[in-house]
């Protein structure tokens, strides 16, 4: 399957284990399916595809703390145990890995799989890996969804300096998307939720302003009402047909998400972002989503991994 993609690895069924406490298929490990041939995705039976991006090359290039390449499998392991409250069809399609700093190759191959799945009517729920997943994911979507906006829940803008031809990293994905949009003469629709004042330099705030980025600071989420926050999102998505939703786990406070490269002492609580995430899903405009930056070696008692799985489970159960 995907034999022409050297960095693709098929799913590992051993990750999907859990408690069998009823005769019914009530947990994710009992719902998950696997395929042997990509042609099995060319059907009218539409599925939600789990796809991992096992890379922390972008984090290493960004001088961060590595370990996120182990994130996808750990998220799958934790998701497997959770109750599943819907009858959707789920497929674990495996991972795209990154070895020997071949980040651009891995991003290209990940994008090809995303494009193939969406072209055949499926939805992607992807697990990182570093936030370099965002540039890979966007590349797979952009040609299929012309009026596509990006909403990123993140402590950082990830708009670090980037010029075409340079090597990207976990801090440049949205600069890469902006450059791509400029080349294609497309509007750059980018919204960042949970921005930390001391997680971004003044020049990054200036760049966000120059690129007309919509954003809410972490302080905004503490101080403003939920109705005000939803009105802000409404304003951003009003003229968009589709949304690519990406979640960087470092948007959350370190007590909830210690297992990330850049933990945030003043980060958000899960229930500050969950209503906004659910609202976006309920808008019907989200076509693809991912969750990034889980680093199992940096985690404490699986807190971050379990939280990542719970966030995914909540969103998959939102209609």
From Swiss-Prot:
CDD domains: Formimidoylglutamase
A biological process term (GO) from this entry: L-histidine catabolic process to glutamate and formamide
Record field: catalytic activity: N-formimidoyl-L-glutamate + H2O = formamide + L-glutamate
Metabolic or biological pathway: Amino-acid degradation; L-histidine degradation into L-glutamate; L-glutamate from N-formimidoyl-L-glutamate (hydrolase route): step 1/1
MF-aspect GO terms: agmatinase activity; formimidoylglutamase activity; manganese ion binding
Enzyme superclass (EC): hydrolase
EC number per UniProt: 3.5.3.8
Cofactor: Mn(2+)
Cofactor note: Binds 2 manganese ions per subunit.
Pfam families in the cross-refs: Arginase
Keyword Metal-binding on entry: yes
Alphabetical list of NCBIfam families matching this protein: hutG (TIGR01227)
Function in brief: Catalyzes the conversion of N-formimidoyl-L-glutamate to L-glutamate and formamide.
Family, similarity comment: Belongs to the arginase family.
UniProt name for this protein: Formimidoylglutamase
């Amino acid at each position: 399957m995907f034999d022409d993609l050297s960095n693709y690895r098929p799913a590992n069924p051993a990750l999907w284990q859990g408690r069998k406490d009823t005769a019914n298929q009530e947990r994710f490990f009992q719902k998950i399916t696997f395929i042997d041939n990509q042609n099995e995705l060319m059907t009218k039976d539409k599925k939600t595809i789990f796809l991992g991006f096992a890379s922390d090359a972008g984090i290493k290039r960004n001088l961060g703390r590595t370990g996120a390449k182990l994130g996808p499998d750990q998220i799958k392991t934790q998701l497997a145990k959770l109750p599943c409250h819907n009858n959707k069809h789920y497929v674990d399609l495996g991972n795209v890995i990154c070895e020997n700093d071949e980040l651009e190759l891995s991003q290209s191959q990940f994008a090809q799989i995303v494009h193939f799945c969406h072209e055949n009517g499926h939805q992607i729920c992807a697990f990182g890996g570093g936030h370099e997943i965002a540039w890979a994911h966007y590349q797979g979507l952009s040609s299929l969804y012309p009026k596509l906006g990006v909403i990123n829940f993140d402590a950082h803008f990830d708009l670090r300096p980037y010029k075409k031809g340079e090597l990207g990293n976990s801090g440049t994905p949205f600069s890469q998307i902006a450059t791509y949009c400029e080349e294609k003469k497309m509007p750059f629709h980018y919204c960042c939720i949970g921005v930390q004042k001391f997680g971004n330099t003044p020049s990054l705030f200036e760049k966000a302003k120059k690129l007309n980025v919509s954003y809410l600071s972490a302080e905004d989420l503490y101080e403003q009402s939920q109705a005000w926050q939803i009105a802000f999102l409404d304003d951003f998505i009003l003229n968009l047909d589709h949304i690519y939703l990406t979640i960087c786990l470092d948007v959350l406070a370190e007590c909830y998400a210690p297992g990330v490269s850049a933990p945030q002492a003043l980060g958000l609580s899960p229930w500050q972002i969950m209503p906004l995430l659910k609202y976006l899903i309920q808008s019907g405009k989200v076509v693809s989503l991912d969750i990034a930056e889980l680093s199992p070696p940096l985690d404490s008692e699986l807190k971050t991994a379990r939280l990542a799985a719970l966030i995914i489970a909540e969103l998959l159960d939102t209609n």
